[in-house]
Design a protein with these regions (language model features):
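Thiamine diphosphate
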Residues: 2-133, 196-200, 207
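Flexible, low-complexity linker and terminal segments
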Residues: 2-11, 15, 20-21, 205-255
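Glycine-rich beta-alpha junction loops
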Residues: 57-59, 129-131, 187, 215-223
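Short, hinge-like loop/turn segments at secondary-structure boundaries
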Residues: 69-71, 115, 140-144, 230-233
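Active-site-proximal loop->helix
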Residues: 109-114, 134-148
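Conserved thiamine diphosphate
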Residues: 140-207
Length: 255
């Protein structure tokens, strides 16, 4: 007796803006999720052929292998400067940087502050996992008070290291005409909210309205010394209380 075959409709697939090369990230790392969101947005806005991504130092340094668009590698922290030059020479391009906190909030602080203050027409995806992941788990500018790292095993002491940098709040002060938001990817609801914010940041550039940055709170289970599930719980319990989610600057709020 022959069984009838039902044609299955594919309802979930890899974004067209991503290559087939597997992710190099540790289990539970948030970079893979965020990469996919960026690629989905590029597909939906139909901007892949005109997109140019800027790769920066850190765990995501090899993302030029993941995004199926033109990519440029920048020196450590210099992504916004490279993006600025590229966008000014090729205003028709959709230029974005993808940076971690050890890149953007440390050696690259000057570049991101001035790019935002000029309201450069670029998009920045900024991943904040509170630690230098690629180099062994050292303290980052975003490491929380008391958080233990390989460079400060006793935990961050604000009297010695200062306080963690809230980049989204800082940039909203120097660039009130920009779109600046902080989101998280610790569960499905917040993943979808992150995607919406990424789409808005790209739309700012497409419309010629200026600078857009989305700070994404992500997990680094390897350097946090936690399993993936507990890492997501830590984002809710410890990270978000210091780095509250929200939209800190948006042109729609003016007036």
């Amino acid at each position: 007796m022959c069984r009838s075959h039902t044609t299955m409709k594919r309802v979930f697939k890899k974004p067209d803006s991503m290559t087939d090369i597997p992710f190099p990230y540790c289990p539970g790392c948030s970079h893979g999720t965020i990469h996919r969101l960026v690629a989905e947005v590029m597909d939906e806005l139909d901007i892949t052929k005109m997109a140019v991504g800027i790769t920066s130092a850190g765990c995501s340094v090899r993302n030029w292998r993941q995004f199926d668009c033109d990519m440029v590698m920048a020196l450590h922290g210099r992504g916004p400067a490279v993006a600025t030059g590229l966008k000014r020479v090729h205003p028709e391009a959709i230029v974005f940087t993808y940076q971690g906190d050890g890149d953007l909030a440390a050696i690259g602080t000057g570049e991101i502050v001035h790019a935002a203050s000029r309201c450069e027409c670029i998009t920045v995806i900024y991943v904040n996992n509170g630690v230098f992941g690629a180099t062994g788990g050292q303290q980052a500018p975003t490491t929380l008070i008391g958080q233990k790292t390989t460079s400060y095993p006793g935990g961050r002491d604000p009297n010695f290291s200062g306080y963690p940098l809230r980049i989204a709040e800082l940039l909203s002060l120097v660039s009130p005409r920009s779109y600046i938001a902080r989101r998280s990817v610790h569960d499905v609801k917040h993943i979808m909210a992150t995607k919406k914010a990424i789409q808005e940041s790209f739309q700012m550039q497409i419309d010629g309205r200026g600078f857009g940055l989305v700070e994404v709170l992500g997990a680094c289970p390897t350097q946090w010394k936690l399993d993936p599930v507990r890492s997501m719980e830590r984002i809710v319990e410890e990270v978000i209380p210091y780095y509250p989610l929200g939209t800190f600057s948006s042109p729609q709020k003016e007036g």
